[in-house]
Amino acid sequence: DPPQKEVTLLEKEQVIDALERDIYNRSFPADSKEKEFMGLSDANAVGVDRDRFENEVLYPVPDEEDFVAVYDVREYGIFPENKDNAPALNILLKQIKNVEGLKFLRFPQGVYLFHATVNFADIEDLYVVGEDAEWRMTEWTSAMDIRNCKNFHINGFEFDYHPASTVTGTVISTDEAKRSVTLKLGEEFDMSDSRFNGGKVKYGSYMEYVWDETYGAYIPDKDGMLRYNSTGDRVENLVGGSYDPAAHTLTIAFSADSGYRAPDEGTKVSVSYTMYEYGMFMFQSCEKVYMESNDVYASLGMTFVTYNVKDLYMNRTNLRLREGSERLMTSTADGLHANGCYGDMIVTNSLYEASHDDAMNICSFYNTVSSYAGNTLVCGASSATTNYPIMEGDVIEIYDPQSMELIETYTVVKVTALGLSYDLTVDKRI
């Protein structure tokens, strides 16, 4: 067993020295002038307020008397003992969306199983609140699809998949000729489930880990193999895989061009059987989305996916490894992936760890001006996924496409939109 974690308080100088020795940071010569300008001007501004991180409430659930309707899910056939609560909840949500005013959807204590995606569409002023409740997905698909919702809140849940699409094992043997690695799997991982495809990875990854004394945890080994079959760039490093249920072992074979390097026996490895297939929370064309006091332990792709969302607020909503589990990966892609969003995006007091791809990927795009005259201009987006809605009162900035210098700033006074194109009237002559 690895050594137990010990909490040690470090002086600022010790932290800086530790960061310089971290395997993910490049080193600078002792006399490097570049080193002088590294980091923040005030190192004391860095840190975590543990009390705020664990307890601060920024978006509280109103008192029950403030709601026009309160829905206890048990009264609508939604119970922890059900094998699949998705059908009953989807029916209830169709009723809820026709009710005006503040609505409270309560999940009392328990583990609620869902075998399909739950769809929240065209709903305003809804609080989805777990009271020591877990939302557990038993199918490999998105947990929630939220579209065209406004003032939408998710509070107080744990979210997980059973089974999750990642497994953890320890290297027990390798075969140079076959370019293969055999892992002894942890007891919690049952790969007899058909979704594991007998051990062969269609889309997913193989990642080796190393024990880090500083963090008291396994972290990705920068000198080890990270190989994958990608849904995005069509890379295929993992050409074979087989699960032996009797021995509880998994053997992965690598392609000839994968850069195979046999790991040492005892190396910890995480293997995932999804990559980008399913976002866990799919927010699209929503306004004022709030998530607070939630823990997410696994996802089958990107975890929080936001397209064309105005104002996103997340507090104490963690993407973290589940305590007691041997899993080493949380999200098989990005933690938070935002595309074409606008307004506020505020994430506070939250932990994002062990994702396969970016912790946060905030994508931003631009419109291209095609013509202008007087105080009007025509501009357009390159695609629907990069199409920001432009509205009266918005401030737009015009940049030189070659130098990226700011040319001028205007306020929009009139908008005519047609598909991806916008005819804008602004507050002064262009």
Language-model segments: residues:
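Long, low-complexity, polar/charged, intrinsically disordered or flexibly structured peripheral segments
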Residues: 214-285, 290-292, 297, 428-429
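Surface-exposed loop/turn segments connecting beta-strands in extracellular beta-rich domains
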Residues: 114-116, 123, 136-138, 152, ...
